[in-house]
C-alpha cells in the first residue's frame, strides 16, 4: 500500500535509497482529500453533513480526482436515501467537485446543493389488532390507549425516525399489560412522492394474554433467606393479569432489600 511504499527502502548497487518528497508533496499529504460543503436548509445541511457515507473517504490524502468522481455517483444516491428518511422523496441535487490548491484544509472541495422540495405529510393512519386483544372487551381500554397515544397524526411531517418511534411506542403499550409477547405483525408506510403524502398502517398481534403464576425460586439462590422471604418481598399477585409495572416494583423491592447481589 502507499504507506508501506513510502516507509520502505530499496537497495540498488549496494546503496540504501529512500523516497524523496518535495515540499508540495508534504503539504498535500497533510491535507484531507476533500472537504464537503452542503448547501441546503440548515437542518438538512447538518443532517447530510453528519451522515453522508462520503465522509468516510475524506481523510484519504492519496485519493485521486478520478476516484473521487466515482464516489460522487454513489454519494448522490446516498444523499437521496438520507433525504427520504426526513420525508423528502423528490429532491433536486447537484454535486460538484473543484480543486482547491490554495487551501490548507483539503485538496478539493465537494459542493452538494440540495433543493429538498416538499416534505411528505401524513395523510392517514390505520391501526389494527389481531389476537385475543382484538375482541376482548376487557382489553378495550388498552386498545384505546394504543390508538389514542399514537404519536403521528395526519398533517404532520413524515420522518423515518418518527415512524419507527410511533410503531415502537404502540408496541410498548401493548407489552406493558397482559400481552408481554405481543409483536408488530405488519407495518407499511405507503408514500406517494408526487402528492407528498404518506399512508401509514400497522397491525399489532397481541399473542396470548398472561397472568402471574405462583412464585418459583431456585433452591441454590435462596439458601440463606428461603422461599418465603422472597415471596413476602416480591408480593406478586398470583392469578392477576400480567402488569409490567407490578413486576418492576417487585424486582425493585427485592433489589432494595440488600439480600441479593442482583435482581433481573
Report residues per predicted region.
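Periplasmic polypeptide-binding modules associated with outer-membrane biogenesis and secretion
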Residues: 1-50, 56-264
Amino acid at each position: 500500500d502507499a504507506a508501506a511504499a513510502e516507509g520502505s527502502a530499496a537497495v540498488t548497487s549496494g546503496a540504501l535509497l529512500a523516497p524523496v518528497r518535495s515540499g508540495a508533496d508534504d503539504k498535500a499529504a497533510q491535507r484531507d482529500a476533500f472537504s464537503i460543503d452542503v448547501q441546503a436548509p440548515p437542518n438538512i445541511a447538518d443532517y447530510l453533513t453528519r451522515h453522508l457515507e462520503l465522509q468516510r473517504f475524506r481523510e484519504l490524502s492519496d485519493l485521486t480526482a478520478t476516484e473521487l468522481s466515482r464516489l460522487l455517483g454513489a454519494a448522490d444516491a446516498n444523499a437521496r436515501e438520507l433525504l427520504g428518511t426526513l420525508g423528502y422523496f423528490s429532491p433536486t441535487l447537484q454535486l460538484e467537485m473543484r480543486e482547491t490548491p490554495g487551501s490548507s484544509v483539503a485538496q478539493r472541495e465537494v459542493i452538494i446543493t440540495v433543493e429538498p422540495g416538499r416534505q411528505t405529510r401524513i395523510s392517514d393512519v390505520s391501526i389494527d389488532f389481531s389476537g385475543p386483544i382484538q375482541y376482548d372487551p376487557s382489553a378495550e381500554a388498552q386498545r384505546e390507549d394504543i390508538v389514542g397515544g399514537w404519536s403521528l397524526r395526519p398533517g404532520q411531517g413524515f420522518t423515518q425516525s418518527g415512524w419507527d418511534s410511533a410503531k415502537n411506542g404502540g408496541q410498548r403499550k401493548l407489552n406493558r399489560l397482559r400481552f408481554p409477547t405481543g409483536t408488530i405483525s405488519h407495518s407499511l408506510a405507503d408514500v406517494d412522492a408526487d402528492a407528498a403524502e404518506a399512508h401509514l398502517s400497522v397491525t399489532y398481534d397481541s399473542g396470548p394474554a398472561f397472568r402471574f403464576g405462583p412464585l418459583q425460586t431456585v433452591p441454590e439462590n435462596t439458601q440463606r433467606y428461603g422461599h418465603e422471604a422472597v415471596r413476602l418481598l416480591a408480593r406478586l399477585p398470583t392469578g392477576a393479569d400480567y402488569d409490567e409495572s407490578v413486576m418492576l416494583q417487585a424486582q425493585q423491592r427485592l433489589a432494595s432489600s440488600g439480600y441479593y447481589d442482583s435482581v433481573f
